Amino acid sequence: TGYSICYELGIFKQKIVDGQQVELPDNWLGLGDAWLIPKMDEVEEVRFGGTVEDDWDSQGRHQIKHTGYDTVLAVPRDMEIAGYKTEHGNTLRLWDAKSPTPVDMSLFSSGQYLKAVEQKAMAESISKVLYPEDNHYEGKSLRLKQQYFFVSATIQSIVRKHRAEYGTLRNFHLKHVIQINDTHPTLAIPELMRILLDEEGYSWDEAWYITTHTIAYTNHTVMAEALERWPQQLIERWLPRIWQILKEISGRYQDALTTYFHGDLSKVAPMAIIWGGEVRMANLCVCACFKVNGVSALHSEILKKDVFHDAYVRTPDKFTNVTNGIDHRRWLAESNPKLDALIQECCGKDKYLLKPEALKELEKFQDDAGVLTRLGEIKAANKKAFAAWVQRESGIVLNTDAMFDVQVKRLHEYKRQLLNVLHIIYLYQKLKADPHFDFTPRTYLFGAKAAPGYAVAKRIIRLINSVADMIAKDPICKDRLQVVFLENYRVSLAEKLMPASELSEQISTAGKEASGTGNMKFMMNGAVTIGTLDGANVEMHQVLGDENIFLFGLKAHEVAEMKEKGYKSYEYYVHNPELRAVVDQLNVGFGDGVTYEDIARRLLFGDGGMADEYLLLADFESYRDAHVRAGLAYRDPKRWNKMALMNIARSGIFAADRSIRDYARDIWNVPVRTIK
């Protein structure tokens, strides 16, 4: 069973106005919720605020009195999900936040209508919006409430069902694994402890044993700012009993660390759970979970060697890797029916749908001119279909004769959409200087949402649109260079775009991307990757070889070494005249009255931090050279189609089926039934 919150609204619907992102409500439930079945007999109560008093009964047993709290009801809404040709289905349980009191009748009767429904509004705000902005106190409070609401309802539900079946929780850890997906559900740890201690009467040691043999943690990021830290005052205010338990866990863990590291605070402090008035959720996971896994081989090594190094030294058996995977039945068979038909013809009907490793059978067609030609025809047809959709939606006419060069993902500096833009500016400048400049025509497609409070990311979106407008207005670029920002990037758009894509931009700074799954979706649909050795790109390269991927840039250890020695982006600017011209163009602007001195300054001098933190200028020349190689390969359709076919053939290892088998074998310790 999977658990989450039944959000009414998604993160936001993106609108581009004058080149800038504007956030509008994205009404998820308004699309219809007929498949969500409310289970009113399984409603859970979640408590916020109030005060906690310690008490002891006549036999000296510790008891907790929690008073003055606010109650929010968690209403489960279940979606049943059928498997493909299996005898089983799974349940996705989404919790809907409701107030136990729809209206305060005494206030309503006295004419205080807004005040009368305030409690209802506050309760329902918990399941209102996915990822509310949290750069202010109210936003942080709401995020914390969302996380505790979600885990408290979930843990209570699991415990209730287990108790009904077995009559005891002593075997709880033998019947359940609770997989924490990133740090957002980390409060499941103290919540399970709370139930075992306060409601079931277990001793601390008994409760801790059950908890630490039940919960496992998947880490999804090495970015320090994404490893959640909560102000302790916030937890004290809204979750007083959870705070008490966290303090006890933290104190015991810190004592154990102090003993293990012989009082070395330089080791203890970074691993502490509560330190400097903050509660560090990732450290809590590493302390309490029986397994910690990264989501690509490189990512898991970085966790062991850097992010959680001392924890790894202390408990090496706790750490493992499970590389991410994607649902090939959705992202290939359903999204790309023409390609699915060709694969079924070559590999034996729907064999690959049950066994994605069967895609490897395509390799025997790598020199089959007929199959390669058909593969090229399918890609061309998908490009035309996508272009027709874009024209209907936006009025923009895509050049389908050019290579579709695609970068679609969350807008973040480490993902380096800006590096892509700098290269586009370079191409434009070369075209302006020499209209006969020889390069392979490109249609660049971007799709990205920036977090509402992430100012730099929003500026990069505006920059992309400024460059796109300049190129669209310049006749010299006609049929040679085009840039389009696809508004409101989302799953339904991705399902149309992936089958039409030809070059997949996976260009994050090496060592920063945990895994990525977009890279796998592109690969499975026959797009060739241009990328760094980062995240799952490393494993893609291992199965593809140098000949089927365009690699560039510094490796993760080289990035670390360069930063340690003192990276000076300005030297690259000074010594490379073409790069200098590109950066200088940011200061001048792109003909729409908007300049980007702030971005140029950030690259050359920093903006209160390190200049060019993600090493765009260091990787620029290597990136440009990789694009030249990609362009030359694209001009040879037979070679390109062979590369595309090899990408599809070797993508089976990145199917979610393999990923789930790895979790089942290495973490959950459950048998996997082989489908014949």
Q: What kind of feature is each model-predicted range?
A:
Residues T1-K676:
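A conserved ligand/cofactor-binding region detector
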